[in-house]
Amino acid sequence: QNKLLSVIAIIGTALAIAMIMCIVLIYQARTANYEPEINRDRTLSIEMTIAQKIDDKGWNMGNQLSLRTIKECFYPMTTAEAVSAVHYSMTSLAATPDGTREVKCAVSYTDDNFWRVFGFRFLHGKPYGQEFVSGEKKLVVTRSLARRLFGIDNAVGRIISLGFVDYTVCGVVADESVLAEA
């Protein structure tokens, strides 16, 4: 009967429903599978280690796993479908070999299993395989980086200098979604 109470009740109900919808959308964005994280719901990520000595109370904490730990503890796992190691580096300067074009970009150092865990859509070329173990300097770039450095989408076979080390582009992938964390 009272119009003011009716308006307050309707607005309160609408705000409650809107808040619940926002919470569900945030949860969906954090947990659903979005390209390239197509296996997000089945992925276990280990991002830091804590080691405690047995003989005393000392301990050590690190935010990155060593390559030795990855090779000895994680690569031999048989229960996991795929095990991949990723090192997220700081922003780096990518340049053409002659230095005429330079672009700041985020660089992730990965292994060959990275391409099995994540579902990047290759536009040109293919991912690197086991050749990275032998020390071949290959990399995969996004379409936007290829365009900014070379002015074209297909940069396969071109050379990019990262930190004064030359790498050969073996693949070009589509730019990732803003919802991706990888």
Each language-model region and where it sits:
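A residue-level structural signature of the nucleotidyltransferase/glycosyltransferase Rossmann-like core
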Residues: A82, V107, K137-K138, I159
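Short strand-coil-strand connectors
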Residues: A94-G99, G163-V165
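Small-residue transmembrane helix packing/gating motifs
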Residues: I50, I54-T69, A82, D98, ...
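Short, strongly hydrophobic transmembrane alpha-helices
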Residues: L4-T31
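Membrane-proximal extracellular/periplasmic loop immediately following the first transmembrane helix
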Residues: I23-L93, R101
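Generic structural signal for small/hydrophobic residues in well-ordered secondary structure
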Residues: N2, A9, R30, I46-M48, ...
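Mid-to-C-terminal secondary-structure elements
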Residues: D111-P127, L139-A182
